[in-house]
């Protein structure tokens, strides 16, 4: 199953794969670039949340915490958690359609399968999706990884116990 951002760059990238595979993609608004604009320390205007100077974000321990990264004044003012919850909620709805239901920090494999799910999206939102699936702060992904345009990230589910699935990333970018 193929899903694509409504934005041009991702649609253009998807078009080549879709044409070769003779497939179509469902457009999902939540796959657009992650939108919140935060006023970074020492700045006067909003900027994307995934492009900070290292000393600015690394000085705040909360940014490393999967449960509290969004609780800083900067992110609260930018409504980052609300956007994060919307995006990850939509991801969970999509995964439910494919047989995986979020249960705390893992997924229940209610209809285990070998579906391949392909998402054509953008770096900022990719890191949001990965942070949710891997249970880590997106700040570490936004600032510790780099995915060039048209890069491919691969995840799979691991079901070591019947009905319990977790996601593993086998390649990034």
List where the protein language model places each region.
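Conserved glycosyltransferase catalytic-site signature
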Residues: 11, 123, 149
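Amphipathic alpha-helical segments that form well-ordered structural scaffolds
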Residues: 13, 86, 90-94, 125, ...
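Acidic, low-complexity terminal tails and accessory targeting/binding regions
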Residues: 34-52, 101, 105-116, 127-173
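Internal catalytic-core helix/loop-beta-alpha segment
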Residues: 72-106
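Beta-strand elements within well-structured catalytic alpha/beta cores of enzymes
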Residues: 3, 114-121, 125
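Alpha-helical structural signal in soluble globular domains
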Residues: 16-20, 94, 132
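Phosphate-coordination/substrate-recognition cap region in phosphate-metabolizing enzymes
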Residues: 1-69
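A short, terminal or domain-edge coil/loop segment
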Residues: 54-62, 80-93, 157-173
